[in-house]
Amino acid sequence: KMAVILQQVVGNQYGDRYYPSMSGVARSLNYYPIGDEKAEEGTVNLALGLGKYIVDGGMTLRFSPAHPSKVLQTSELDIALKETQTRFYALDLKNAGDNFSIDDGFNLLKLHVKEAEKDGSLRYIASTYDPYDQVIRDGLYPGGRKVITFANILQHDVFPLARILRWVLRYGQQEMRRPVEIEFAVTLNHDRDKTGTFYLLQVRPIVDSKDMLDEDLTTIPDEDVLLRSNNSLGHGIMNEIHDIVYVKTDHYSASNNQNIAWEIEKINQQFLNEG
């Protein structure tokens, strides 16, 4: 047997296109915490428009719901201009008739952020780049490139998105008894200031794989540890590793990086030749 689920698209209408103020994917487990973040606090990827943009690997804004004011992508001017969203997806209402296709994107428009500015949907979502003062100002101002920072949502709490996500992730994980991933959308009201609607679209458990490690590493005795690091990314199990090349840190100097790289390359080639 197979079930077919029809899910209503969430959003606001802007002429011949339809899209939410923002869409996102949130996870209750963060495998790559940054700075003060903790793995159990989760992580969020947020974008303007339909969520297909996130699924397709578009440039989203990544933040921790426990630290919404600390966003790496907007921490520096150069990073914010290079690593923030410039495109978004909207539903094409002119192509919403009987012209169906197996392509799930047949009735979607991939638009530049400038089109959202024309729609008036960037209020509370975008900031404005001032090329004269070389700063990004929270909010919309005449002239200047519009940068999708969600600053008024995350830093100024115009809409309590971070609090809602913390609550949903906590109770979702509690009820499923395992880490969860959620999909959500938000529509902001343009006729009433600082109001909107949060839509919880999907809740699903994070699927385990053989590359994920579900073990308390702090319980492993020191005498059984080969290598230990307090500054590493993620964790897991890889059964295909047979040799480890270790660069001693006692007398390590960055000035010798090129020579060290050559030495490591020779060792790697030796392993490859030996099969």
Feature locations, PLM:
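Conserved mixed alpha/beta core segments that line enzyme active sites in large multi-domain catalysts
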Residues: 1-275
